[in-house]
Amino acid sequence: MKKYKTGIINVTGYAGLELARILESHPSVELCSVTGRSLAGKKLSDVFPYLHRLDLPITENLEGQVDVAFLALPHKEGAALVPALLEKGMRVIDISADFRLKDPALYQAWYGFEHPCPGLLEEAVYGLPELKRKDIAGARLVANPGCYPTSAILGLVPAFKSDLIEPSAIIDAKSGLSGSGRTPTVKTIFCEADEDVCAYSIGTHRHQPEIVQELCRASRGVIPRVTFCPHLVPMSRGILSTAYARLKQPVTDEEVKEIYRQFYKDEPFVKVTAEPPHTRYTRGTNMCFIYPVVDALNEQLIVISCIDNLVKGAAGQAVQNMNIMLGLAETEGLEAMATLP
């Protein structure tokens, strides 16, 4: 059976390493090339022994021709590479934010750089399969969603599309420390992060315009007012988002749950739960668990959603997008369930 060739540009970050782990056991693809400038010349399995079956050399540049190239570079660093990859006939999935926003001016405002290839922003497909499956299938370039936006958007889209809520929402989200990347900072080292919870980037987080952009599409072009407050919590993986929105009219708890169940009934990686979900349910999986509930006294909808920020929030969703682009079963390579404890 033919195996599709894949490569990872910058394998050494958490998202790149998670990609390597998932792709190694994928039955229909072969991981052929991985890059990482600081570790070039070493073997992936030597530097990261837990990837013991991956004896690939880490190189400075992608070697050979691949069918799908995954970009796992930090924001601003990968966009300029994309035109050359596309010219070589490769399909590209970018895990950074470089192609998520459609308005090039937003990159200057939120990321502090002028986009090097704004002409590709319109072509890039926002890679949230539950909403963009048909567009992803034919795409050359997919912008993998951010971790916070994945959790928040999946939690709120059914309510916006069903016209259940006013066009505004408050999103309180809590993330494990891996969401801040592998480069250590004062706020992520053990002695600072352990037994501590803190909010950060209140009202200024870079994922906010991404959330607004996609919820706007779900609410028939009405630009929603989104208040987004992220927090760091002392765990390695996981995001739990709690979203609050005012109901347009009275609705029962069961009616809302049925709307959500129907919206996601055919989605292999979204489960509407009967009880509030835990982040540990998602650990190492591509699942998103969602719990909608009505606060009847205050006429509010509350939606809790949780994901593994490195899987459904990054590498797993990238592989899900790859499966769709290559015409493979969407769940291929992503069937793992969480471990307990």
UniProtKB/Swiss-Prot annotation:
Q: Where are the transmembrane segments?
A: none
Q: Where is the active site?
A: 147
An example GO biological process term is: L-arginine biosynthetic process
S-S bridge residues: none
Q: Where in the cell is it found?
A: Cytoplasm
Which coarse location class applies to the principal site listed for this UniProt protein?
A: cytoplasm
Among Pfam families, the record links this protein to: Semialdhyde_dh, Semialdhyde_dhC_1
InterPro entries hit by this protein: AGPR_AS, AGPR_type-1, NAD(P)-bd_dom_sf, NAGSA_dehydrogenase, Semialdehyde_DH_NAD-bd
Sorted UniProt keywords:
Amino-acid biosynthesis, Arginine biosynthesis, Cytoplasm, NADP, Oxidoreductase
The catalytic activity of this protein is classed by the Enzyme Commission as 1.2.1.38
What this protein catalyses is:
N-acetyl-L-glutamate 5-semialdehyde + phosphate + NADP(+) = N-acetyl-L-glutamyl 5-phosphate + NADPH + H(+)
**Entry GO MF terms:** N-acetyl-gamma-glutamyl-phosphate reductase activity; NAD binding; NADP+ binding
Q: Which residues form the signal peptide?
A: none
UniProt family annotation = Belongs to the NAGSA dehydrogenase family. Type 1 subfamily.
Described function: Catalyzes the NADPH-dependent reduction of N-acetyl-5-glutamyl phosphate to yield N-acetyl-L-glutamate 5-semialdehyde.
Instruction: Return the protein name.
Output: N-acetyl-gamma-glutamyl-phosphate reductase
Starting at the broadest rank, the lineage of the source organism is:
Bacteria, Bacillati, Chloroflexota, Dehalococcoidia, Dehalococcoidales
